[in-house]
Amino acid sequence: MNKLITYGGALASDIISTFMPGASTLSKFADDYAEKKRREALDIFISEVSQGYHGRIDFDEHDIDPLIGIVHRFWKAVEDGAARENLRLLAQVIAGLKKNKELEDADQFRKWAGILEQLTRDELLVLGKSLRIRRDITNAGTDVANDFWQRLEPSLEAAGYSKREIGALCASVSRTGLLIPLSGFGALTYMDTPWLEKLGKLADLENLSQR
């Protein structure tokens, strides 16, 4: 399970040793960092599976084959430098897929991993607020044209973003397929897609909406 981390730490050590003075000390820091990331990722995974967002999740013998591929993909995200919050979301997705009896469809996890692993905190905040707004609209039964954007934009402004920053952030998030741009209201706006609600059932996105 930790081979990717081992290889990544070794590569970092080789690069540092080649190009930087005081390399032996710095190489040790690189190795220690890789080991720290491995431990953190393992703790996050165990925490989410044992007592996380979906409660306790028990894996069965028939889960072994898909789980090997899924954990390998999770570990690749660790090796690629995914932040703690992103790794927690990925672990929640794994637990959610098991809970929803979708674990055998490994493509599902690969899709969500590709979306979540490198999102920034700002982008995650946009997703959290977007999901909360969609659920508020659904619960109120008041879905009208452009209602989603008319709620999302001021919510992000209240969080401290300028209109230009909001446009850039939403454009960035739209690459994931969770938001899509619309141009029928005089200016470019954004709308959530069904993927957002589906992801929200697997990972605690709404908790990210606080700022």
Regions found by a protein language model. Name each.
Residues 32-77:
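Amphipathic, membrane-active segments
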Residues 87-211:
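Long, helix-rich, hydrophobic modules that act as membrane-proximal anchors or helical bundle/coiled-coil regulators
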Residues 7, 21, 25, 41, ...:
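Residue-level detector of well-ordered alpha-helical segments, enriched
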